[in-house]
Amino acid sequence: MASGSRATPTRSPSSARPEAPRHAHHHHHHHSQSSGGSTSRAGGGGGGGGGGGGTAATATATATESVSKAVAQYTLDARLHAVFEQSGASGRSFDYSQSLRAPPTPSSEQQIAAYLSRIQRGGHIQPFGCTLAVADDSSFRLLAFSENAADLLDLSPHHSVPSLDSAAPPPVSLGADARLLFSPSSAVLLERAFAAREISLLNPLWIHSRVSSKPFYAILHRIDVGVVIDLEPARTEDPALSIAGAVQSQKLAVRAISRLQALPGGDIKLLCDTVVEHVRELTGYDRVMVYRFHEDEHGEVVAESRRDNLEPYLGLHYPATDIPQASRFLFRQNRVRMIADCHATPVRVIQDPGMSQPLCLVGSTLRAPHGCHAQYMANMGSIASLVMAVIISSGGDDEQTGRGGISSAMKLWGLVVCHHTSPRCIPFPLRYACEFLMQAFGLQLNMELQLAHQLSEKHILRTQTLLCDMLLRDSPTGIVTQSPSIMDLVKCDGAALYYHGKYYPLGVTPTESQIKDIIEWLTVCHGDSTGLSTDSLADAGYLGAAALGDAVCGMAVAYITPSDYLFWFRSHTAKEIKWGGAKHHPEDKDDGQRMHPRSSFKAFLEVVKSRSLPWENAEMDAIHSLQLILRDSFRDAAEGTSNSKAIVNGQVQLGELELRGINELSSVAREMVRLIETATVPIFAVDTDGCINGWNAKIAELTGLSVEEAMGKSLVNDLIFKESEEIVEKLLSRALRGEEDKNVEIKLKTFGSEQSNGAIFVIVNACSSRDYTQNIVGVCFVGQDVTGQKVVMDKFINIQGDYKAIVHNPNPLIPPIFASDENTSCSEWNTAMEKLTGWSRGEVVGKFLIGEVFGSFCRLKGPDALTKFMVVIHNAIGGQDYEKFPFSFFDKNGKYVQALLTANTRSKMDGKSIGAFCFLQIASAEIQQAFEIQRQQEKKCYARMKELAYICQEIKNPLSGIRFTNSLLQMTDLNDDQRQFLETCSACEKQMSKIVKDATLQSIEDGSLVLEKSEFSFGDVMNAVVSQAMLLLRERDLQLIRDIPDEIKDASAYGDQFRIQQVLADFLLSMVRSAPSENGWVEIQVRPNVKQNSDGTDTELFIFRFACPGEGLPADIVQDMFSNSQWSTQEGVGLSTCRKILKLMGGEVQYIRESERSFFLIVLELPQPRPAADREIS
């Protein structure tokens, strides 16, 4: 979309736009209206010139929109929170419907702050575990603890009877050393965890209470004041069983992930349905749902798996405020949230009075639900819940981590929510496994969403192309009267064109008098913009909205000229919404007041009664593109200029067809700018001076250089590394001449603080950009980022034989190797691995590879990397080998290591798996091996070169003798025939001398061969060519058919005679060798022609056909002839070289196989002989 295409949203002062609702069964539920109004999205005036800042503008507008929505919702959430709190204090009940209809009152900053603090620092936990907060220093001082800590740890006075020989249990008190609460071995584990950089990757620790040795899962995370330790009682006394349980949970998750990955693409519904089935199977909850958050922040249940006797919630929509923004923020931090029993009394957290604010429980697995959430759950019959965030990437491959460790590119797409009708608590390892499953779901979903977006873009582009086509053939009314029509461009219930005072409606639309009223309102209230979109005409301030009723609620309009308009209409949302849940019964008197899914749905329908589905950004972009196309069509007509697309009775005058084509191109060009902008590959363009005039979002992201900064910079001088300068200059000069090169690698600089001095490698295709008169006006580069592949070589070292022998071999070519036992513990870590990571064998063996070795010791880039690694290890243990899996981590010193991981199953003799064996492919080891291979190749080459040098040297002497003998014969008296034979012999000798000079072939390969041109007789050339084939023809008893006109024999030409001879002789001899010996023949046909050049000179064209009957050349020789690098036959090498020489002389060759014969077709262009004065070696 062209830059500046969306105006600042306009809001009618009176319009209080209720947010479309959301219904959720977790976290803090509040209900309300959102302030806001219709969004007036105006299409901007300008087209999308080179590089178009268009998408940047769109993306920014979208981002700004979502931020403003979130901020508005924070205000509402805070106000509702206050209402709920007051209702409790005053003894009244919280009235759902009343709160929804209450007029919005602005919340003060203190109110919002208090609300956030109450949610994040509520001071209570759930009673199924206990919480400690410990100072993050050597003292391990207790800063806070939950009131149930002493009981759960068996440290209350009534748990033990003091005796003379045993010390009294340590008290759980502020300031006490937390290590004393646990067994000595557990204290050591805690100390080690506190020393780790990424403390949470070690979760869960298996620790025991000091007095009773009761086992706990300890889940640790760092906060502003220290480390929070959540202790959840473990169900078994044996740590081995606990580890087995954790590994089993991971295996189940990996199995589910593998099934997700095996699903056919292009079906998001199937993906969501599969996820709910797997989660229910893994966790055993009564109901599992996928919630999706829509663009306007309201939510919908899109998939469900439930116990048969439960009411279905599939298709339910609920208000945005059902899941407050604060909760959504928390889900990005803490992606899995369990409430074990909503009826359980929360436990208070006692904390050090010296702490400035209540303890932050954001990351705690035990944080108590807020009162209104517990009430909501109880109302809907859900006693326990498990909620998991579904996070997708909102753009960009590399996660740039922002504050709080959250990637700025991450977006909360929705939630997977589990409900149970009785208390339910699932152990931490299983929740952790579910988190992995969610990450895999997010990755898969992201791919599906991108695919869906591309398909929708393609559909829109196809429709736009067809609409353009109509505009060019007919009057503009064709876009409403024919198929496809403007209704096919975006999802709508009706559309209309108002053109030259006439109304052309389609589908569900206002009447003509109503449309005139709307146009008058647009002129008065929105006359200064170029369009408007709203999901509620009533909220937008249109007074006639009530008369339109439910049929027309939403409208998008594009102004073409001050008096011509395009409209799209949508009916109210409710008709789109289907829910299989129970309807509201009149006898449920309190149904509207209680917080319940049915009330949420009812509230949602109430809010959207006079509202349509919102217009999405992509839809507005499509409308805007069509607006620009039409504006071009109408503008000249309105001005009445001579080059207009003036429309006379629906027919366009023929003389204007060409200009119409130009206008169509400019429109399509604008649309192309939008597609280039949103492309996922780097695209950039330069003008004829080599300065940037196009720079899409992907290249901006890769280089760290924004569109604005890149524009006008010199590609060669400012943006590439010195080593690429020559390549790029050559690329540019060739493309500006119309010669387009493909697959050229260039090295671009990166910009911005973190990226300075970095480089990205891009393989580009250069395309000449032309204007409508076909003049080249610049160069466009379409690229592919290969930076990752560049770091790692392509080939793997194939390793066979005994593991131990390989692992402990000191040979530097042995790659870094590590191994896993069946429980994912590290069982091997070789010397190369120690060198690569900086961690010694003793430090890592026995530790978990997932989360501990790779995660805590060797940090990974983001949680998705850990999920992918987990899938590889578990599958390898289970018997599925992986090859060349891209794997990156930070070593002990923080250096980023990129590698390829190969993982194989380790088996006993009986085939039973005992773990996985992994090795990393690092560029340096690969390069060493490549050098070794290169050295061996060089040795071979040197031996060949010696042989070749010997032949070239020794052949010169007899050639010299032949030349001398020829010169003696020339001085004797010869008749014409004898003189002809002598000239043919001399021509063959000179051809041979040239070939000997070519021994290295380098000049032919790189195109630098110097052609020695002079005037020559074509008759001499043909005699020399035929003479070289005569012996073989006689030997094989083949008939030679010559079809050479006399004018060819007498013709003169200008070029390199002996090269032409060499090439023609080689192709002819190939035919002689391939002809069948029984009744065989070979035909030589030559035809002359003359081609006139644009500068007035003539070029002679010679067309040769060398044919023989039957199958002709063997397939491998033909393949070799057209190959540039790999040959399997000697004859093929010769033909390939001749093909290249022919190309250097401006000729070309084709090999054609017909049913009864095969032939070479050779076309050679030669200039006519120059005047004598000009002749020289060129």
UniProtKB/Swiss-Prot annotation:
Gene Ontology CC terms: nucleus
Gene3D superfamilies: 1.10.287.130, 3.30.450.270, 3.30.450.40, Histidine kinase-like ATPase, C-terminal domain, PAS domain
Biased composition (Polar residues): 1-15
Binding site for phytochromobilin: 372
GO molecular function: phosphorelay sensor kinase activity; photoreceptor activity; protein homodimerization activity
Residue span(s) of domain Histidine kinase: 950-1170
Keyword vocabulary terms for this entry: Chromophore, Photoreceptor protein, Phytochrome signaling pathway, Receptor, Repeat, Sensory transduction, Transcription, Transcription regulation
Region of interest called Disordered, as start-end residue ranges on this chain: 1-58
Matching InterPro entries: GAF, GAF-like_dom_sf, HATPase_C_sf, His_kinase_dom, HisK_dim/P_dom, HisK_dim/P_sf, PAS, PAS-like_dom_sf
Domain annotation GAF: ranges: 267-449
Comp. bias regions, Basic residues: 23-32
Coiled-coil residue spans: none
Record-level GO BP terms: detection of visible light; protein-phytochromobilin linkage; red, far-red light phototransduction; regulation of DNA-templated transcription
Organism superkingdom: Eukaryota
PAS domain span: 668-739, 802-873
Keyword Repeat: yes
Protein role: Regulatory photoreceptor which exists in two forms that are reversibly interconvertible by light: the Pr form that absorbs maximally in the red region of the spectrum and the Pfr form that absorbs maximally in the far-red region. Photoconversion of Pr to Pfr induces an array of morphogenic responses, whereas reconversion of Pfr to Pr cancels the induction of those responses. Pfr controls the expression of a number of nuclear genes including those encoding the small subunit of ribulose-bisphosphate carboxylase, chlorophyll A/B binding protein, protochlorophyllide reductase, rRNA, etc.
Assembly and oligomerization: Homodimer.
UniProt similarity note: Belongs to the phytochrome family.
Protein name per its UniProtKB record: Phytochrome B
Species in which this protein is naturally found: Sorghum bicolor
Organism ancestry: Eukaryota, Viridiplantae, Streptophyta, Embryophyta, Tracheophyta
